[in-house]
Amino acid sequence: MLLPKRVKYRRQHRPKTTGRSKGGNYVTFGEYGLQATTTSWITSRQIESARIAMTRYMKRGGKVWIKIFPHTPYTKKPLEVRMGAGKGAVEGWIAVVKPGRILFEVAGVSEEVAREALRLASHKLPVKTKFVKREELGGETNES
């Protein structure tokens, strides 16, 4: 499971979940990607579950990049505890995902295999997603 090695502060305020993603909106490493179309928190367990689903379907062929990381801690107080007495203990780690963010990238497999692997991964996540291909910058190449 993914979690930071060390953090400056153990507990944080809850992050904003409005607007579109500022960065990470393009497929940069692989050939195909899984792009979020809605906003949600994704836990480190959900990321790991999606990764396992993809790699098992691809039978360890190709390469998978995880483009999100759960930096943000979320806290929870125990059941049946009255309000007050400080903030609760850290329950887990989340990545805030906004529309437009690329979650996973895949390379080294055919488009059909990549599409199905990313579809299986999307079923493990709490966001709506779409399959995207890499867009080359600059348009045509000048080879004469």
Swiss-Prot record:
GO molecular function: rRNA binding; structural constituent of ribosome; tRNA binding
Superkingdom of origin organism: Bacteria
Family matches, as Pfam families: Ribosomal_L16
Keywords assigned: Ribonucleoprotein, Ribosomal protein, RNA-binding, rRNA-binding, tRNA-binding
Comp. bias intervals (Basic residues): 1-19
Region entry Disordered, spans: 1-23
PROSITE patterns registered for this protein in UniProt: RIBOSOMAL_L16_1 (PS00586), RIBOSOMAL_L16_2 (PS00701)
GO biological process: translation
One GO cellular component, as annotated: cytosolic large ribosomal subunit
CDD domains in the cross-refs: Ribosomal_L16_L10e
Stated family: Belongs to the universal ribosomal protein uL16 family.
NCBIfam families on file: rplP_bact
Oligomeric form and interacting partners: Part of the 50S ribosomal subunit.
Record's function text: Binds 23S rRNA and is also seen to make contacts with the A and possibly P site tRNAs.
Protein name, entry field: Large ribosomal subunit protein uL16
Organism annotation: Staphylococcus haemolyticus (strain JCSC1435)
Organism placement in taxonomy: Bacteria, Bacillati, Bacillota, Bacilli, Bacillales
